[in-house]
């Protein structure tokens, strides 16, 4: 009885983790955010962007917005390398964007 209950609880936990993920253009993207010396500055790499360039751009924009809202309470971003300016996926199947949270 204990083992089936444990398995059921673990399955429920993994479902909760995945419910917070957002799909863009039908795909889930992993992003890496690096913060600059000035905490307002950030760089984002979106991995596996070869699946959908449009989706990867939106995933990067989403990650940036979440960062700025959580750190500074605003979604206003000054783009240094705007997602809209990204026209191709790199050889490592990723895209790179860069910006600054405006406060």
Residue ranges and their predicted role:
Residues 1-5:
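Sec-dependent signal peptide recognition
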Residues 10-12:
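C-terminal motif of bacterial Sec signal peptides marking the signal peptidase cleavage site
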Residues 14-17:
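Bacterial signal peptide processing site
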Residues 28-29:
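Alpha-helical assembly-interface signal, strongest on the long, hydrophobic N-terminal helix that forms
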Residues 34-62:
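Post-signal-peptide N-terminal segment of Sec-exported extracytoplasmic proteins
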Residues 65-73:
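Sec-exported extracytoplasmic/periplasmic mature domains
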Residues 77-93:
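Acidic helix-start/capping segments at beta-turn-to-alpha-helix junctions
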Residues 93-103:
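C-terminal edge-of-domain segments
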């Amino acid at each position: 009885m204990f083992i089936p209950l444990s398995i059921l609880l673990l399955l429920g936990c993994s479902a909760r983790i995945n419910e917070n993920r957002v799909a863009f253009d039908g795909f889930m993207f992993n992003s890496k955010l690096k913060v600059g010396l000035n905490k307002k500055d950030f760089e984002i790499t979106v991995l596996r962007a070869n699946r959908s360039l449009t989706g990867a751009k939106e995933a990067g924009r989403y990650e940036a917005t979440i960062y700025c809202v959580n750190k500074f309470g605003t979604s206003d971003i000054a783009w240094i390398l705007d997602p809209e300016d990204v026209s191709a996926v790199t050889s490592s199947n990723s895209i790179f964007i860069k910006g600054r949270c405006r406060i």
